[in-house]
Amino acid sequence: MTGAGGQIGSWLVPKLRGLYGNSRVIATDIRQLDPEMAESGLFELLDATDSEALGEAVESHQVGLIYHLAAVLSATGERDPRRAWHVNMSSLEAVLEVARHQGCAVFTPSSIGVFGSGTPKDLTPQDTVMQPTTMYGITKLAGELLCNYYHQKFGVDTRGVRYPGLISHGAPPGGGTTDWAVDIFYSAVEDGH
């Protein structure tokens, strides 16, 4: 799992380790995880844009499914859109190439950030007007298309879900649009409330 220390990964790694065993879920992140998660199973410091290191990790651990969660989130992406494009697209392309050559499946989340102001607000269909207004949304839409391409062209089993805004206690604010809500809870705990 790339991006294991983020809002989704910090919850999903322990859940998957509980289901499949600590040695069957390899958590990776660009930064060190909290000690409890890092020590509960396999962990590697890994930059998901480094396709060679990613390929070596997948091969050495005989990975069958990559959960690709590493990303520059929306608010951070607006402060540095070039970095958001590079990290989000280069890491996804690296994951898809590794999956293609090593025969593993890929799950990568998308976001309601793919939509825009022209998208119907109620009962939004899967296939509709998509005019994202953030670099994060643009990379998620491009990512959906890239996953579809790898499935159609190379047979890579890719899956995804468009998540709404996420709020999690499992990870500190990481640059997303819902960080203000997460920060409220962290600040309250730090201030003794």
Which role fits each region the language model picked out?
Residues 145-170:
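Conserved beta-loop-beta element that borders a ligand/cofactor-binding pocket
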Residues 48-87:
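NAD(P)H-binding glycine-rich loop region in Rossmannoid oxidoreductase-like domains
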Residues 86, 93-135:
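Conserved Rossmann-fold NAD(P)-dependent oxidoreductase catalytic core, especially the SDR/UDP-sugar
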Residues 139:
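Active-site helix of classical SDR
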Residues 2, 28, 66-72, 106-112, ...:
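SDR active-site strand-loop-helix element
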Residues 1-19:
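N-terminal Rossmann NAD(P)H-binding glycine-rich loop of SDR-like oxidoreductase domains
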Residues 38-50:
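Rossmann-fold cofactor-recognition segment
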Residues 20-34:
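Conserved glycine-rich Rossmann-like NAD(P)H-binding loop of the short-chain dehydrogenase/reductase
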